Every structure is written in structure tokens, then in C-alpha cells.
Amino acid sequence: MNFHVLTLFPEMIEQGLGTSITGRAMQKGLVSLNAVNIRDYAANKHRKVDDYTYGGGAGMLMQAQPVYDACMAVQSGLNKPARVIYMTPQGSIFTQQKAQELALEENLIILCGHYEGIDERVLEEIVTDEISIGDYVLTGGELPAMVVIDTVSRLIPGVLGNGVSADTDSFMNGLLEYPQYSRPEVWRDKKVPAVLLSGDHAKVDRWRKEQSLERTRLRRPDLYEKYMQEHPDAAKYCK
């Protein structure tokens, strides 16, 4: 998987993703990261890529041409056109299902806005997907872009080392993950549930399913209702 990030702050992207799981994935060659500085495509010596908005209003807007040129420079080096994802609070909410869809791509171009956003004309010209990570506003698209890259990278074979880890994550099957415990067996008078110490894998699996359903019912009733509609047989796990 190759990620190409169009940004005004490439060092933010590189530093933010250069450690932990994504950093190791890049070292192994499982994913690559190409942080493209949009300022490199400015048509002036000051590398200025923003200007005032027509019609008035506060703040500056990223201009169309530098964004377009940066995107076309990346696309020209690919075997086939890549999807261009614009990180914006106006986009559809990013989900695990969307991450699974994106993980099937060979290349992804992620566009990060800044200031008051980007000239609408270039968005209409190059963007294939608009994605939001939540109903709030950030300073720029870099943090959301890193969220997308981290989430998608986890789904690339070999990145986690143990494929089961990703398969049991929250949202992978439409439910929140069950609670987990490690040593010691007793901590501050709190004991690990006895079923997890029983060695009975069937009982452990049932307990985890029950806990996953109950946790989802309490914390995300919207997900719970959807899951139960799609899996009516799961009622046998409900207490």
C-alpha cells in the first residue's frame, strides 16, 4: 500500500507516522509514505499557496492550481489513477468498513486542507472521496489523514504480525470488542473473570461474545440495534 499525502506540513505527517506499527510497516516495505509539500508547486518565489476568498469572509483559502499540480504530479507516476481522499468535516464519517474498502487499493492520495479550506473548483476536479473523522473542526487535515493511514495500515497483511489481532478489533464484526485482561490474576482486589482461567475455549468464546454484545448495547446502542437486525440468532448470547 502506498500513501501519498498532499499537505502544507509534510514533516508533521512523516514524524507522526514514523513510529510504532506504521513506522515498522514502512521499514518492512509493507507500506510506503510519500508526503508531498503543496508549497513546492506554488507559482511564486515566496511559495505562497493561499489567498483571500471571493465574496469576503474571514481567513484565507488554499488556491486551486498548486493543489491540482501537486495531485497531478503524483498521479502521473502511477500505473493507474488513484482515489483522492479529501479530509473534511463535510465528508462521510470514516468507519472500519470504509477502512477495509480502502485497504484494497494499491495507492491512495490524501489531500489535507488548511486555513479556511480549498478552492471548490479543484475539489470538483480531482477528489473522489470526502471523509470526516467526526463532527468537529481541526486546524488542518493532517491529523485526520494520519488516522486514516493508521487504520488502513493495520489491515494490510503482515503489518500487525498476527492477523487475528485485527480480526478481533472493535467494529471488525460490527460490535465493540470484549474486555481483556493480563497478569497479575488479581490486581487491587479485582480478579480476572474465572471463565478466562478455565481453559475451556468454548466457554471463553461464548463469554467474549456475550461481553461484546452487552458492551455494544450499553455504549453504542445504534450499532447494537443494527447488528441484532442483521444477526437475529445472536439473541441467544444476550443475558
Regions found by a protein language model. Name each.
Residues 1-75, 201-223:
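N-terminal nucleotide/polyanion-binding subdomain common to many enzyme families
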Residues 4-6, 34-36, 83-85, 108-109, ...:
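Hydrophobic/aromatic beta-strand patches that form the interior of the parallel beta-sheet core
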Residues 20-24, 100-104, 126:
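Short, solvent-exposed amphipathic alpha-helical segments in soluble enzyme
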Residues 38-41, 114-118:
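Short glycine-enriched loops at secondary-structure junctions
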Residues 63-114, 120:
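S-adenosyl-L-methionine/SAH cofactor-binding core of RNA-modifying enzymes
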Residues 122-169:
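Structured adenosyl-cofactor binding patch, chiefly the S-adenosyl-L-methionine
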Residues 143, 155-194:
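Internal, active-site/partner-interface "lid" segment
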